[in-house]
Protein backbone atom coordinates (compact mmCIF):
# COMPACT_ATOMS: atom_id res chain seq x y z
CA UNK A 1 0.00 0.00 0.00
CA UNK A 2 0.97 3.62 -0.50
CA UNK A 3 1.17 6.02 2.45
CA UNK A 4 2.09 9.69 2.61
CA UNK A 5 3.27 12.19 5.21
CA UNK A 6 4.81 15.66 5.42
CA UNK A 7 8.24 17.01 6.36
CA UNK A 8 10.13 14.90 8.89
CA UNK A 9 13.30 16.99 9.44
CA UNK A 10 15.10 13.96 10.85
CA UNK A 11 12.30 13.10 13.31
CA UNK A 12 11.03 9.60 12.46
CA UNK A 13 9.15 8.77 15.64
CA UNK A 14 5.83 8.71 13.77
CA UNK A 15 6.77 5.50 11.90
CA UNK A 16 7.59 3.34 14.91
CA UNK A 17 4.20 1.73 15.48
CA UNK A 18 2.99 1.19 11.91
CA UNK A 19 3.96 -2.44 11.33
CA UNK A 20 4.20 -2.05 7.55
CA UNK A 21 5.80 -4.68 5.29
CA UNK A 22 8.21 -4.79 2.35
CA UNK A 23 5.43 -4.14 -0.16
CA UNK A 24 4.42 -0.86 1.50
CA UNK A 25 5.75 2.55 0.42
CA UNK A 26 5.93 5.69 2.57
CA UNK A 27 6.10 9.01 0.71
CA UNK A 28 7.83 11.87 2.55
CA UNK A 29 7.05 15.23 0.94
CA UNK A 30 10.47 16.83 1.31
CA UNK A 31 12.81 18.03 4.08
CA UNK A 32 13.39 14.43 5.06
CA UNK A 33 16.45 15.21 7.15
CA UNK A 34 18.83 12.44 6.05
CA UNK A 35 20.91 14.50 3.61
CA UNK A 36 21.22 17.62 5.72
CA UNK A 37 24.47 17.46 7.70
CA UNK A 38 26.33 15.43 5.04
CA UNK A 39 28.36 13.67 7.72
CA UNK A 40 28.08 10.88 10.29
CA UNK A 41 24.85 12.37 11.68
CA UNK A 42 23.09 11.58 8.40
CA UNK A 43 24.59 8.11 8.34
CA UNK A 44 23.30 7.33 11.84
CA UNK A 45 19.78 8.32 10.82
CA UNK A 46 19.99 6.20 7.68
CA UNK A 47 21.17 3.21 9.72
CA UNK A 48 18.04 3.56 11.85
CA UNK A 49 15.72 3.83 8.86
CA UNK A 50 17.42 0.88 7.20
CA UNK A 51 15.81 -1.38 9.81
CA UNK A 52 12.28 -0.63 8.61
CA UNK A 53 10.78 -3.27 6.34
CA UNK A 54 9.01 -0.81 4.06
CA UNK A 55 10.38 1.61 1.46
CA UNK A 56 10.69 5.37 1.93
CA UNK A 57 9.97 7.36 -1.24
CA UNK A 58 11.42 10.81 -0.62
CA UNK A 59 10.81 14.11 -2.40
CA UNK A 60 13.51 16.81 -2.42
CA UNK A 61 12.80 19.67 -0.01
CA UNK A 62 14.66 22.92 0.48
CA UNK A 63 16.52 21.88 3.65
CA UNK A 64 18.54 19.02 2.18
CA UNK A 65 21.16 18.36 -0.47
CA UNK A 66 19.98 16.96 -3.77
CA UNK A 67 20.89 13.26 -3.96
CA UNK A 68 22.48 13.73 -7.38
CA UNK A 69 25.05 15.99 -5.68
CA UNK A 70 26.10 13.26 -3.23
CA UNK A 71 28.67 10.79 -4.56
CA UNK A 72 27.22 7.74 -2.79
CA UNK A 73 23.93 7.99 -4.72
CA UNK A 74 23.43 6.50 -8.14
CA UNK A 75 20.54 6.61 -10.56
CA UNK A 76 18.47 3.48 -11.20
CA UNK A 77 15.15 2.57 -12.80
CA UNK A 78 12.31 1.98 -10.36
CA UNK A 79 8.51 2.34 -10.51
CA UNK A 80 8.76 3.11 -14.22
CA UNK A 81 11.05 6.12 -13.74
CA UNK A 82 14.49 7.13 -12.52
CA UNK A 83 15.30 7.37 -8.81
CA UNK A 84 18.38 7.89 -6.65
CA UNK A 85 19.53 5.25 -4.15
CA UNK A 86 22.57 4.34 -2.08
CA UNK A 87 23.73 0.72 -2.06
CA UNK A 88 23.93 0.69 1.75
CA UNK A 89 20.34 1.90 2.16
CA UNK A 90 18.18 0.35 -0.57
CA UNK A 91 14.89 1.19 1.17
CA UNK A 92 15.67 4.95 1.21
CA UNK A 93 14.65 6.10 -2.27
CA UNK A 94 14.81 9.67 -3.56
CA UNK A 95 12.58 10.61 -6.48
CA UNK A 96 14.04 12.49 -9.42
CA UNK A 97 12.38 15.82 -10.14
CA UNK A 98 10.14 15.76 -13.19
CA UNK A 99 9.83 11.97 -13.33
CA UNK A 100 6.53 10.15 -13.73
CA UNK A 101 6.17 6.97 -11.70
CA UNK A 102 3.69 4.12 -11.55
CA UNK A 103 3.25 3.24 -7.89
CA UNK A 104 0.47 1.08 -6.54
CA UNK A 105 -1.32 1.40 -9.88
CA UNK A 106 -1.24 5.21 -9.83
CA UNK A 107 0.63 7.60 -12.14
CA UNK A 108 2.58 10.01 -9.94
CA UNK A 109 4.44 13.15 -11.04
CA UNK A 110 7.15 14.42 -8.67
CA UNK A 111 8.26 18.07 -8.42
CA UNK A 112 10.54 18.83 -5.47
CA UNK A 113 12.28 21.97 -4.30
CA UNK A 114 11.34 25.27 -2.65
CA UNK A 115 12.81 28.56 -1.43
CA UNK A 116 14.17 28.86 2.12
CA UNK A 117 12.72 31.96 3.73
CA UNK A 118 15.51 31.77 6.33
CA UNK A 119 18.25 31.70 3.67
CA UNK A 120 20.00 34.91 4.78
CA UNK A 121 19.87 33.91 8.43
CA UNK A 122 21.33 30.49 7.67
CA UNK A 123 24.17 31.94 5.62
CA UNK A 124 24.97 34.58 8.26
CA UNK A 125 25.14 31.92 11.00
CA UNK A 126 27.05 29.37 8.95
CA UNK A 127 24.13 26.91 8.94
CA UNK A 128 23.38 24.61 6.03
CA UNK A 129 21.83 26.21 2.98
CA UNK A 130 21.64 24.46 -0.40
CA UNK A 131 22.08 26.71 -3.42
CA UNK A 132 20.08 24.50 -5.80
CA UNK A 133 17.16 24.08 -3.39
CA UNK A 134 14.80 25.19 -6.17
CA UNK A 135 14.36 23.76 -9.66
CA UNK A 136 16.36 25.46 -12.39
CA UNK A 137 14.62 27.31 -15.19
CA UNK A 138 15.49 24.47 -17.57
CA UNK A 139 14.07 21.84 -15.22
CA UNK A 140 10.82 23.77 -15.03
CA UNK A 141 10.57 24.19 -18.80
CA UNK A 142 11.25 20.48 -19.31
CA UNK A 143 8.41 19.55 -16.96
CA UNK A 144 5.95 21.86 -18.70
CA UNK A 145 7.00 20.62 -22.14
CA UNK A 146 6.71 16.99 -21.10
CA UNK A 147 3.41 17.01 -19.20
CA UNK A 148 1.30 19.90 -20.53
CA UNK A 149 -2.06 18.59 -21.69
CA UNK A 150 -1.53 15.19 -20.08
CA UNK A 151 -3.28 13.49 -17.19
CA UNK A 152 -1.66 12.12 -14.03
CA UNK A 153 -3.37 10.61 -11.03
CA UNK A 154 -1.27 12.34 -8.37
CA UNK A 155 1.21 15.22 -8.19
CA UNK A 156 3.71 15.24 -5.31
CA UNK A 157 5.61 18.44 -4.57
CA UNK A 158 7.36 20.09 -1.66
CA UNK A 159 5.82 23.55 -1.97
CA UNK A 160 2.48 24.47 -3.55
CA UNK A 161 1.00 26.52 -6.41
CA UNK A 162 0.92 30.23 -5.62
CA UNK A 163 -2.87 30.41 -5.52
CA UNK A 164 -2.96 27.81 -2.75
CA UNK A 165 -0.38 29.41 -0.45
CA UNK A 166 -1.55 29.19 3.19
CA UNK A 167 -1.23 32.84 4.15
CA UNK A 168 -2.02 32.01 7.76
CA UNK A 169 1.40 30.34 7.98
CA UNK A 170 3.35 33.40 6.79
CA UNK A 171 5.77 35.02 9.24
CA UNK A 172 4.50 38.51 10.03
CA UNK A 173 8.07 39.72 10.47
CA UNK A 174 9.00 38.73 6.90
CA UNK A 175 7.69 40.93 4.05
CA UNK A 176 6.42 38.65 1.29
CA UNK A 177 8.11 40.87 -1.30
CA UNK A 178 11.41 39.49 0.04
CA UNK A 179 10.39 35.88 -0.63
CA UNK A 180 11.33 34.22 -3.93
CA UNK A 181 8.07 32.69 -5.12
CA UNK A 182 9.29 31.50 -8.52
CA UNK A 183 8.60 27.86 -7.63
CA UNK A 184 5.06 28.71 -6.56
CA UNK A 185 4.43 30.65 -9.79
CA UNK A 186 5.79 27.68 -11.73
CA UNK A 187 3.51 25.26 -9.89
CA UNK A 188 0.59 27.54 -10.77
CA UNK A 189 1.46 26.86 -14.41
CA UNK A 190 1.72 23.14 -13.74
CA UNK A 191 -1.73 23.16 -12.18
CA UNK A 192 -3.18 25.00 -15.16
CA UNK A 193 -1.54 22.79 -17.79
CA UNK A 194 -1.54 19.30 -16.26
CA UNK A 195 -4.76 17.42 -15.58
CA UNK A 196 -4.59 15.66 -12.21
CA UNK A 197 -6.86 13.99 -9.68
CA UNK A 198 -5.01 14.76 -6.43
CA UNK A 199 -2.04 16.88 -5.32
CA UNK A 200 -0.06 16.50 -2.07
CA UNK A 201 2.57 18.92 -0.75
CA UNK A 202 4.47 19.66 2.46
CA UNK A 203 6.78 22.59 3.32
CA UNK A 204 4.35 24.76 5.31
CA UNK A 205 4.10 22.60 8.44
CA UNK A 206 0.31 22.49 8.48
CA UNK A 207 -2.54 20.27 7.36
CA UNK A 208 -5.14 21.80 5.09
CA UNK A 209 -7.12 21.04 1.93
CA UNK A 210 -7.53 23.54 -0.92
CA UNK A 211 -9.67 22.07 -3.70
CA UNK A 212 -7.77 18.99 -4.95
CA UNK A 213 -4.54 19.92 -3.15
CA UNK A 214 -3.74 18.67 0.35
CA UNK A 215 -1.04 20.03 2.65
CA UNK A 216 0.54 17.29 4.76
CA UNK A 217 2.61 17.59 7.91
CA UNK A 218 2.86 15.25 10.88
CA UNK A 219 0.12 12.74 10.24
CA UNK A 220 0.24 9.74 7.91
CA UNK A 221 -2.47 9.08 5.35
CA UNK A 222 -3.26 5.98 3.35
CA UNK A 223 -3.49 7.08 -0.28
CA UNK A 224 -5.63 4.03 -1.04
CA UNK A 225 -8.31 4.62 1.61
CA UNK A 226 -7.90 8.36 2.15
CA UNK A 227 -7.88 7.75 5.90
CA UNK A 228 -5.32 9.04 8.39
CA UNK A 229 -3.37 6.47 10.37
CA UNK A 230 -3.67 7.21 14.11
CA UNK A 231 -0.31 8.12 15.59
CA UNK A 232 -0.13 6.90 19.15
CA UNK A 233 2.01 7.57 22.18
CA UNK A 234 2.55 4.02 23.43
CA UNK A 235 2.49 5.07 27.08
CA UNK A 236 -1.04 6.40 27.14
CA UNK A 237 -2.75 5.74 23.79
CA UNK A 238 -3.26 9.41 22.95
CA UNK A 239 -3.08 10.28 19.26
CA UNK A 240 -0.27 12.71 18.46
CA UNK A 241 -1.13 15.52 16.04
CA UNK A 242 2.11 17.23 15.01
CA UNK A 243 0.87 20.81 14.71
CA UNK A 244 2.87 23.84 15.77
CA UNK A 245 1.44 25.32 18.95
CA UNK A 246 3.10 28.53 20.11
CA UNK A 247 3.06 29.73 23.68
CA UNK A 248 -0.06 31.81 24.15
CA UNK A 249 -3.24 31.85 26.17
CA UNK A 250 -4.83 28.59 25.05
CA UNK A 251 -8.16 27.92 26.71
CA UNK A 252 -9.56 25.28 24.38
CA UNK A 253 -8.40 22.23 22.45
CA UNK A 254 -7.42 23.14 18.85
CA UNK A 255 -9.37 20.10 17.66
CA UNK A 256 -12.59 19.49 19.59
CA UNK A 257 -12.64 22.99 21.20
CA UNK A 258 -13.19 21.43 24.63
CA UNK A 259 -11.67 22.99 27.74
CA UNK A 260 -10.46 19.78 29.42
CA UNK A 261 -6.84 20.42 28.43
CA UNK A 262 -3.38 20.39 29.95
CA UNK A 263 -0.64 22.63 28.55
CA UNK A 264 2.97 21.48 28.70
CA UNK A 265 6.00 23.52 27.67
CA UNK A 266 8.39 21.52 25.50
CA UNK A 267 11.46 21.61 27.73
CA UNK A 268 12.23 25.16 26.67
CA UNK A 269 12.15 24.26 22.98
CA UNK A 270 12.51 27.55 21.12
CA UNK A 271 12.09 28.22 17.40
CA UNK A 272 12.43 31.69 15.88
CA UNK A 273 11.95 33.27 19.30
CA UNK A 274 8.74 31.38 20.15
CA UNK A 275 8.41 28.88 22.98
CA UNK A 276 6.53 25.87 21.66
CA UNK A 277 4.15 23.85 23.76
CA UNK A 278 2.06 20.70 23.76
CA UNK A 279 -1.68 20.83 24.32
CA UNK A 280 -3.01 17.59 25.76
CA UNK A 281 -6.78 17.13 25.45
CA UNK A 282 -8.45 14.62 27.76
CA UNK A 283 -11.71 14.77 25.80
CA UNK A 284 -10.64 13.90 22.25
CA UNK A 285 -7.55 11.98 23.47
CA UNK A 286 -5.10 13.93 21.33
CA UNK A 287 -1.79 15.65 21.91
CA UNK A 288 -1.05 18.72 19.79
CA UNK A 289 2.60 19.77 19.65
CA UNK A 290 5.49 20.74 17.42
CA UNK A 291 7.88 17.87 18.08
CA UNK A 292 7.12 14.41 19.45
CA UNK A 293 10.57 13.95 20.93
CA UNK A 294 10.40 17.16 22.95
CA UNK A 295 6.98 16.78 24.51
CA UNK A 296 6.57 13.02 24.80
CA UNK A 297 8.48 12.78 28.12
CA UNK A 298 6.35 15.63 29.49
CA UNK A 299 2.98 13.93 29.13
CA UNK A 300 1.43 13.97 32.63
CA UNK A 301 1.64 10.68 34.52
CA UNK A 302 -2.12 10.65 35.08
CA UNK A 303 -2.58 10.18 31.34
Briefly describe each language-model feature range.
Residues 9-15, 33-38, 62-69, 101, ...:
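Active-site environment of divalent metal-dependent phosphoester hydrolases
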Residues 5, 10-103, 176:
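Core catalytic region of metal-dependent phosphoesterases/phosphodiesterases
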Residues 258-262, 289:
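Short functional micro-motifs and their immediate structural scaffolds
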Residues 90, 104-181:
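Active-site-proximal loop/helix segment associated with metal-binding centers of metalloenzymes
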Residues 55-59, 77-78, 163-232:
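Conserved beta-sheet core of the metallophosphoesterase superfamily
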Residues 280-301:
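Short metal-binding segments enriched for Cys and/or His
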Residues 250, 278:
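Residues immediately within or flanking Cys/His clusters that coordinate Zn2+
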Amino acid sequence: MLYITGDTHGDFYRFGHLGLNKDDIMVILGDVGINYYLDECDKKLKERLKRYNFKFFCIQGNHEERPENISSYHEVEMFGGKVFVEDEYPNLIFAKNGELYNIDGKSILVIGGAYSIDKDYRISKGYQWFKDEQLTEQERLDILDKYSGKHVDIILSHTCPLRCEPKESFKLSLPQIAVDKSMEYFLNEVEQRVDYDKWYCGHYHLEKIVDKLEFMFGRIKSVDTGEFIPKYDFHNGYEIVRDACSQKDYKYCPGCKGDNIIIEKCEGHNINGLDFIAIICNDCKKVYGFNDVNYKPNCPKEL
